[in-house]
Amino acid sequence: MAIVSSKSPDPAERRSQAKTKPSVSEPQDSLVRPQAAPEESQRPEDQIRPQRLADYIGQPELKDVLGIAIAAAKSRQESLDHLLLYGPPGLGKTTMALVLATEMGVQCRITTAPALERPRDIVGLLVNLQPGDVLFIDEIHRLPKVTEEILYPAMEDFRLDITIGKGQSARTPSITLHPFTLVGATTQIGALTSPLRDRFGLVQRLRFYEVEALTDIVQRTARLLNTPLDQAGAEEIAKRSRGTPRIANRLLRRVRDYAAVKAPGPITGAIAATALELYNVDPCGLDWTDRRLLSHLIENFGGGPVGLETLAAATGEDAQTVEEVYEPYLLQIGYLQRTPPGRVATPAAWRHLGYEPPQASGQLTLQQLLTEPET
């Protein structure tokens, strides 16, 4: 299976893309953010990616569904149905697209939606696909409208409708395409338009990983990187990885660096814990910014409730960054609650930071939290 990436546009495209700002200002120095770090995007990850469905760890329901789809497509000698993968970043959507291509014995063409801002960008990709090839579009919710409309007939009828000319002299010739499989990946499925979403025959969600599955992933990566690691060391890294394989592999690399300099030999649980404390990743996977947000909420606002804008101003972050970068994991592990009157730190968050939770009598009742308007 060959992997072809279209993430390196021509100079004109690079200049155009440089003008596009990301929707959220995200910290780039944190080890526990699920977004790919720049060096992870640039460095080939083929050596640690699983190549076959049987080697893909975790996501058992997804593997069962896709295993059936692959077997059925092979038996009919057809291409796979179009697939939409959604879920938080770092859970293996790109890896799954590559696995599908390997299982089907075809090429995988990789691109991102922001790179397809002009019609010729997507047309060039589609006309060069061979029968059965996989076209993977990351961040598909960010497709420009004109590009999305070109995809409609391509996905349904394997046909390109190109308008040439304007006004009464305009004509729309059709170009027949080879059958292909479009795999779209998104972290915001609600941002997709209904016409695009409805054209996917398979829509599957990737879920956060359990510690056991992450431990297996860490051990597998360590073997591929020739890094001696015991069970306790793998578990220590896994439990601080926020349920995300990308973070687990990133933490393993940092622990490997620490061990090479400070503690040569197999990485034990104690070594992994010491290394990750050095990098400000605590046993629950919280980093300094997560703890600062909770500390502000507890120390300055008595644990809440407090409105999003107020909390963002107190922490020096913009509201969108707080809502989309910091809060999801805090909500996932039960350290933060979103209520109509605002954000509330849970008793578990108080105890994790070493504070004594206030007595229930001093708290707003659940009914009050559900009915009071947010300030």
From Swiss-Prot:
InterPro entries: AAA+_ATPase, AAA_lid_4, DNA_helicase_Holl-junc_RuvB, P-loop_NTPase, RuvB-like_N, RuvB_C, WH-like_DNA-bd_sf, WH_DNA-bd_sf. ATP binds at residues 48-49, 90, 93-95, 156-158, 199, 209, 246. Its EC number is 3.6.4.-. One of its GO terms (cellular component) is cytoplasm. Residues 19-28 have a biased composition (Polar residues). Residues 210-280 are annotated as: Small ATPAse domain (RuvB-S). Residues 1-50 are annotated as: Disordered. The keyword Cytoplasm applies. It is found in: Cytoplasm. GO terms for biological process: DNA recombination; DNA repair. Residues 13-209 are annotated as: Large ATPase domain (RuvB-L). Keywords: ATP-binding, Cytoplasm, DNA damage, DNA recombination, DNA repair, DNA-binding, Hydrolase, Nucleotide-binding. Pfam families: AAA_lid_4, RuvB_C, RuvB_N. The RuvA-RuvB-RuvC complex processes Holliday junction (HJ) DNA during genetic recombination and DNA repair, while the RuvA-RuvB complex plays an important role in the rescue of blocked DNA replication forks via replication fork reversal (RFR). RuvA specifically binds to HJ cruciform DNA, conferring on it an open structure. The RuvB hexamer acts as an ATP-dependent pump, pulling dsDNA into and through the RuvAB complex. RuvB forms 2 homohexamers on either side of HJ DNA bound by 1 or 2 RuvA tetramers; 4 subunits per hexamer contact DNA at a time. This is Holliday junction branch migration complex subunit RuvB. It comes from Synechococcus sp. (strain ATCC 27144 / PCC 6301 / SAUG 1402/1) (Anacystis nidulans). The gene is ruvB.
